[in-house]
């Protein structure tokens, strides 16, 4: 059974993915990881992360996957004893120079996708150095993954959902070249997600069409700096493999990884929950397994750039034209109290709320839950809607906590 590995950028996200079935979580510190712009944890948070995760029977992996220069690698090496004392399970490394020290401190050494592992010979070498697992390159096909995993002496891990990079294994210099902010040190400003115009100065024609027979649609190269043809051709769609769970499991890989430490708790909750349901459905009865279209609909409801299967079955060419979730989260209140015996939450609402509205409640202990309002009371009287600045009781089967945040989910099509 493959491990379902989910991202955690903060304690709310951590709880959200664990509540929705993550077998393991990965996270970064303020330094040493590829999401420097995300809200990361401090080294003093590691013991708390470990303890919370153990309550769910989940493993914990710390990302240290940037390019480490001399001062940084020595600082990280000096911190290994403190990291190990927190009782997390392992480190995700992009520098093989740390494998020996990581293992000597009782931590598993997992090799990052930034190492661009694309063959079994590399895996055999990593095994000799002491690595327990390697994340395979995103640029491999499903057949290549199956063959590599079959020959590998260590565990393999693959990405199954989330953002894809235009550069091989994320080794991009575009952000550094334009802004002096290095993607390889976790500080990418993602200029690839912007619209671009490609110019072809040698051409005598104002518009030159590419002549590749691989692309389904031609793109335009302008020679006159005319931004009529501006597009986001550097921006790939998000990977989504929810329609291919049986094929993924048959590869024999040990871990399925969801990308998204910089994304919201509701993203982590939804994506983790959907893949958990699909994986469990297949494993419970492989012969009778059927793909459920609602899984795709649910994944589309949270932030995405459109979906693609990456390199699993072919070379991807489609670029993302979308950059949003199905819903807008509107901050409408906070939890005042939760009455466990009657399953009622008292909410302080500073916006309109009515029967049929879909809400989301998030908190460090609660994680992220969604609920459709089907019953509300004010001072013991049933109401169908409430106005701003009201305290209202809502029948809620999920336990929530005081000061949890309350959001109303509004479809973008209604805006």
Task: Identify the meaning behind each predicted range.
Residues 1-117, 121, 136-139, 143-257, ...:
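Active-site pocket-lining/capping segments in soluble small-molecule metabolic enzymes
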């Amino acid at each position: 059974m493959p491990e379902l590995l989910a991202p955690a950028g903060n304690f709310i996200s951590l709880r959200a993915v664990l509540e929705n079935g993550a077998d393991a979580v990965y996270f970064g510190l303020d330094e040493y990881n590829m999401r420097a712009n995300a809200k990361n944890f401090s080294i003093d948070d590691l013991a708390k992360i470990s303890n919370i995760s153990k309550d769910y029977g989940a493993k914990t992996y710390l990302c240290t996957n940037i390019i480490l220069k001399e001062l940084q690698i020595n600082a990280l090496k000096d911190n290994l004893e403190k990291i190990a004392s927190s009782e997390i399970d392992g480190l995700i490394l992009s520098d093989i120079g740390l494998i020996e020290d990581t293992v000597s401190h009782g931590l598993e050494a997992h090799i990052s996708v930034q190492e661009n592992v694309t063959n079994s010979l590399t895996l055999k070498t990593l095994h000799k150095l002491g690595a327990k697992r390697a994340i395979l390159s995103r640029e491999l096909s499903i057949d290549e993954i199956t063959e590599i995993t079959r020959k590998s002496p260590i565990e393999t891990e693959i990405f199954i959902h989330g953002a894809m990079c235009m550069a091989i294994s994320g080794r991009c210099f575009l952000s550094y070249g334009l802004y002096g902010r290095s993607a390889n040190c976790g500080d990418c400003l993602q200029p690839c997600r912007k619209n671009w115009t490609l110019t072809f100065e040698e051409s005598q024609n104002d518009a030159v069409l590419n002549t590749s027979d691989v692309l389904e649609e031609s793109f335009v190269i302008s020679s006159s700096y005319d931004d009529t043809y501006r597009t986001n051709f550097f921006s790939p769609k998000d990977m989504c493999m929810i329609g291919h769970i049986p094929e993924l499991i048959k590869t024999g890989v040990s871990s399925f990884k969801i990308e998204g430490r910089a994304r919201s708790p509701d993203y982590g909750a939804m994506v983790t929950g959907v893949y958990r349901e699909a994986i469990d459905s297949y494993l419970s009865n492989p012969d009778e397994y059927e793909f459920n279209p609602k899984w795709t609909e649910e994944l589309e409801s949270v932030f995405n750039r459109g979906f693609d299967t990456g390199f699993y079955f072919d070379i991807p060419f489609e670029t993302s034209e979308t950059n949003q979730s199905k819903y807008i989260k509107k901050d409408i209140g906070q939890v005042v109290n939760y009455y466990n015996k009657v399953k009622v939450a008292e909410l302080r609402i500073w916006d309109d709320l009515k029967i049929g509205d879909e809400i989301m409640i998030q908190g460090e202990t609660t994680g992220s839950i969604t609920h459709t309002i089907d019953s509300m009371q004010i001072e013991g009287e049933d109401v169908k809607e409430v106005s701003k600045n009201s305290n209202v009781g809502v029948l809620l089967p999920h336990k929530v906590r005081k000061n949890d945040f309350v959001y109303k989910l509004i479809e973008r099509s209604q805006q």
